[in-house]
């Protein structure tokens, strides 16, 4: 099995941006958000179950899953949220582990918002936390996702709090500033961590 670094952080912490920097250096990326889209592609078994359960209201005009609409629905209703999580989380976990077994490259970056909550941390040799203040998360998510503030607060409440997440961290990248102001520092940190992970991966072989 490859050397695995779990990359996690709350909503709008910059996980994808930083994961892409690692990818450019040669790390293999397995991203839970991408896998979550793959398992509900139009016509797939899970897609059909979701449409059957929630109805046409969760579809776009192109007949694909409207993830924003679905998110609004479930965060207002704990029963529906549990139903969807019980359907999706095992499927996402299975697919991520399949991709992990097939992974090639010096090491794997396991990009998972709910790494701790869904106990995927057990597959990681190291945990990298992208750390952001809650007020920064909220402001970014409001701008990026165009969701209402209640929905975003609901997402944040469903994730472990900042201090709990940090308690699991082996490595931390602080990402509170706008990208234009912090890009050079982030790239340097990623480069240093990449070299460190290469060394650890070699030692594991």
From Swiss-Prot:
Q: Which CDD domains match?
A: DPCK (cd02022)
GO cellular component, alphabetical, reads: cytoplasm
Give GO terms for biological process.
coenzyme A biosynthetic process
Main localisation, per the record?
A: cytoplasm
Residues the entry annotates as binding ATP: 12-17
Q: Does the keyword Endoplasmic reticulum apply?
A: no
Q: Which E.C. number(s) belong to this protein?
A: 2.7.1.24
- ATP-binding keyword on record: yes
Question: Where does this protein reside within or beyond the cell?
Answer: Cytoplasm
- Looking at the record, the residues that make up the DPCK domain are 4-204
Record's catalysed reaction(s):
3'-dephospho-CoA + ATP = ADP + CoA + H(+)
What is a single molecular function from GO for this protein? ATP binding
What is this protein for, i.e. what is its function? Catalyzes the phosphorylation of the 3'-hydroxyl group of dephosphocoenzyme A to form coenzyme A.
**Which family does the record claim for this protein?**
Belongs to the CoaE family.
Know the name of this protein?
Answer: Dephospho-CoA kinase
Q: Supply the source organism for this entry.
A: Haemophilus ducreyi (strain 35000HP / ATCC 700724)
Q: What is the lineage of its organism?
A: Bacteria, Pseudomonadati, Pseudomonadota, Gammaproteobacteria, Pasteurellales
Instruction: Name the encoding gene, please.
Output: coaE
